[in-house]
Amino acid sequence: MAFPKSLPARLPTILPAAALAAALAACHREAPAPSAPTVAAPAIDTAAPIPANDAEQRIADDVRTLADDRFEGREAGTRGYDLAADYVAKRFAAIGLAPAGDDGTFFQAVPLLKATREADGAALAVERNGREIALRFGEQFLPAPDFNAAEHDLEAPAVFVGQGVHAPELGHDDFAGLDLRGKIAVVFGGAPARFDNDRRAFYSAKREKLRALAEHGAIGVVMVNTPQDEAERPWTQTADNWQRPEMRLRGADGKAVDSFPSIRGMATVSAAAADLVFADGPRTAAQLFDAAQAGALQGFALPGTLRLAARTKIEPVASRNVVARLAGGDAALAAQHVVYTAHLDHLGIGAPVKGEDGREDRIYNGAIDNALGVAILLETARTLKAESPAPKRSMLFVALTAEEKGLLGAEWFATHPPVPADALVANLNIDMPVLLAPSKDVVPIGVEHSSLKATLEAAAKDVGVALSPDPFPEEVVFVRSDQYAFIRAGIPAIYLDGGTESADGVRDPKLALRKFLRDHYHRPSDEATLPIYWPDAVRLAKLNARIGRRVGDAAERPRWNDGDFFGGKFSRGK
């Protein structure tokens, strides 16, 4: 997955990558076997299950191929990702789908800007009462890559603005009584716990937070980590990968989309160094951390000034979504499209991590996240292509780029679809299904927002699978994967995840999820050698296909529920 997913570690991040050589055969069964791994396989609790039928074997083969070291982690904008995209395009062709990308190909170009921070010239200094406190790069702070300028150096007064949330419909304003114009905002992440999950998700999003800060006149931003932030993602993990590039969509003018140029510098400070930022202020970092937990944060002006400086290497790069189409069978409805998605990219090559065998690995292969999701997407496409008659509405199958960079491939597709925008009726997304213990259920995320709930329930009965509620609703993963780009475009969407109820009373899917998040998520050990339970992967593909079939054949297109927060904010015409 991509941007911050919490839990004991459910967080998308961002890392680098690059390579592979030989051409891939067009036929799935002719695809070359994965090369021998360059490092020892990660330790696992049980032996990886052996695929028991053709469907399980197809999914296993796709996962093992896409998660092989030859693809070097499939980072967006690298040769390794492009070779993975070539593989998926050949699989789409072998299934019998039509190309639906640019110029009659399977590929939709996605223009990106890549920004990489440089250690030289980076500074964060606190000027208080005639003394300067210089924070240490990497250990105490990291500058954010600047998409607007190769170099910045600014000094200004600072204001603590709580979590930087302005939610007038909830009577909440962190900016009340504060003058942020021409100043540097010091801010915590997240949103008040009293907000419902939907609004907390929306106002926690980095894009909305930066927009609010820019609108209130901030010229710089210092994000201060809390202990809760670092319980989910330790500062050392962030600091070890400081050279990872970040990306934004590149507009027609060559500039980054949503880069907020009025904010001229940004940095993040570790929780351990927070007291340096708040030195000589009216409240200590510990007091503010407690206030954040209690929902009682109040902003204030800080004494003295802050200085932010950084250098960034900015360069244009290109990546590709892989897009295929299954034509609908009804003359009146075939122009409408159900969009299936799974992100193809992962984290590439990053900081080496020592495995349980003592050996280091730098390739973040992303077997669960999200080679497995792409393999399920391919099996879904194969299932629907084999059905006769075809669904009445058409189906689009999209392997997306740059999810790990902030849902960029999905955002580009949702705003630049190969068909008229109004022709997209629903999005069905799969991302990081942690299928490491047999379950009797599936967790559908986001079903409460639209009429897709009834469709999903009927499809689940068709397949014979139980549905369970989101086990971690406070983590609002509904806005943390590619479906959110479609939601922002006004398109009802759901996201299918693995189940949480044990099928055999022995192996616990919840425990397996927590272990994966703790030990393997966004680490090199997310390998195809993990004990993926292939029958659950096949079942998820069947359910995915049945949902799409029911949406495809329905008399009415899906609609947002009356009064829904996301429908009200993003539905077409808003």
List each language-model region with its residue ranges:
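C-terminal motif of bacterial Sec signal peptides marking the signal peptidase cleavage site
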Residues: 23-26
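Noncatalytic luminal/extracellular "stalk/propeptide" segments of secretory-pathway proteins
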Residues: 72-192, 314, 318-319
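Soluble metallo-hydrolase cores and metallopeptidase-like ectodomains found primarily
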Residues: 127-129, 139-177, 255-366, 379-382, ...
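His/Asp/Glu-rich mid-to-C-terminal helical/loop segments that flank catalytic regions of hydrolases
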Residues: 382, 497, 502-570
